[in-house]
Amino acid sequence: MAENVSLDVLSYQQHCHWMKRALALAEVAGESGEVPVGAVIVDRNGQIIAESSNRKERENDPTAHAEVLAIRAASQFLNNWHLGDLTLYVTLEPCIMCTGAIIQSRLGLLVYGVDDPKSGTIRTVFNLPDSPASNHRLKVISGILEKPCREQLQAWFMKKRREK
């Protein structure tokens, strides 16, 4: 079962710090014409292991989501695909592809900003971590800087619609 994690003030502040970094990466992605999603992977000492943003359009690669790119980079950096000691911060609830990669990497903790009512597969549309197909019990914190994460995405999509 996906495990909810309780927060103390210090933990909350640390999570906000890293989510702000993910938001900054998402902003750069949005300015480049990508859906503004950013991801940061940190170790237990608070060191950035990997970070990325969406690059589907730039790379013409449907798998170039922020989470997948960050997981790939972290695995290469550590020379190990087991990421159980790491935390992934991402601005938007992961899709099914990204959730699968998160589960397969045995990630220690997932922290995301805002639910995705269209394709979120942590809890919103589907709960992949709790499905019988999941062989890893994922710890999850959601709603960190939810409002700025939601507003960033909404503003980007409103701008895109006006440009059409």
Question: Which residues are covered by each model-predicted region?
Answer:
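Short beta-strand scaffold segments in enzyme catalytic cores
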Residues: V37-G46
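Immediate flanking context of iron-sulfur cluster ligation sites
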Residues: N80-L92
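Conserved hydrophobic/aromatic pocket- or pore-lining residues that grip, position, or stack substrates
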Residues: A22, G38, A70
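A short, polar/charged loop-to-alpha-helix boundary motif
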Residues: R58-V68
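Zinc-dependent deaminase
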Residues: M1-S32, P94-K164
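Short, basic and Ser/Thr-rich N-terminal targeting/leader segments
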Residues: G33-V37, G84
